[in-house]
């Protein structure tokens, strides 16, 4: 009788058919598993089971769920932050000067770029300021395809993370090109295979697209 009573009280485990992948099932067994990312060489796929905890404030190009999914794949020291919109091209103007003025002195940022087909971007831990004589700043930088839930972390091939010039913004560099290249007036975005992140073209199957909007978020408590 005691065994039958216990069996009635125990909730049956969910069947695997209810989930797309095993990783959708694992969060039921403890919070320590919940935020584990999936690593496939240099590519990371977003775990869509992350519950929104941090918030996006005044943002348009990234919502709370997308932000928390993205954060789950970043280093632990970045996961405690909220995202605050500090620059949006459609509001603040489409020039490098406007961009730099709004992003001045901000070290931890998420840059998002919306095109007709995708939203892509980068997470940077170095200030978005003019680079000295065209040099690249090395930092803990990531590029991502927000539409397809993929993040690429920096490889060991080079340290060409980000360069901000009066006529362009470049993220990543290699023999094949940059992961993200934004022209002077923020009209077009180019993306090529990039050695810095060992990433394919983020706009694939296209190599360039017109920019619909750009938004920068600062990370803070």
Language model features: what each stretch is:
Residues 1-221:
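Phosphate-recognition beta-domain surfaces
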């Amino acid at each position: 009788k005691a065994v039958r009573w216990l069996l009635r009280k125990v909730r049956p485990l969910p069947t695997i058919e209810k989930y797309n992948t095993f990783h959708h099932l694992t969060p039921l067994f403890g919070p320590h598993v919940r935020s584990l990312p999936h690593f496939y060489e240099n590519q990371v796929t977003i775990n869509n089971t992350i519950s929104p905890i941090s918030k996006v404030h005044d943002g348009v190009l990234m919502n709370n769920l997308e932000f928390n999914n993205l954060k789950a794949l970043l280093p632990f020291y970045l996961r405690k932050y909220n995202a605050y919109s500090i620059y949006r091209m459609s509001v603040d103007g489409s020039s490098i000067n406007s961009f730099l003025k709004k992003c001045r002195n901000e070290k931890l940022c998420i840059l998002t770029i919306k095109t007709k087909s995708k939203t892509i971007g980068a997470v940077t831990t170095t200030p978005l300021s003019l680079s000295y004589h065209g040099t690249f700043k090395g930092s803990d930088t990531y590029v991502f395809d927000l539409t397809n839930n993929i993040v690429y972390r920096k490889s060991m091939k080079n340290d060409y993370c980000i360069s901000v010039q009066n006529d362009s913004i470049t993220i990543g560099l290699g023999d094949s090109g940059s992961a993200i290249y934004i022209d002077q007036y923020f009209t077009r975005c180019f993306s090529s295979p990039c050695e810095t992140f060992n990433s394919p073209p983020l706009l694939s199957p296209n190599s360039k697209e017109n920019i619909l909007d750009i938004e920068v978020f600062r990370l803070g408590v």
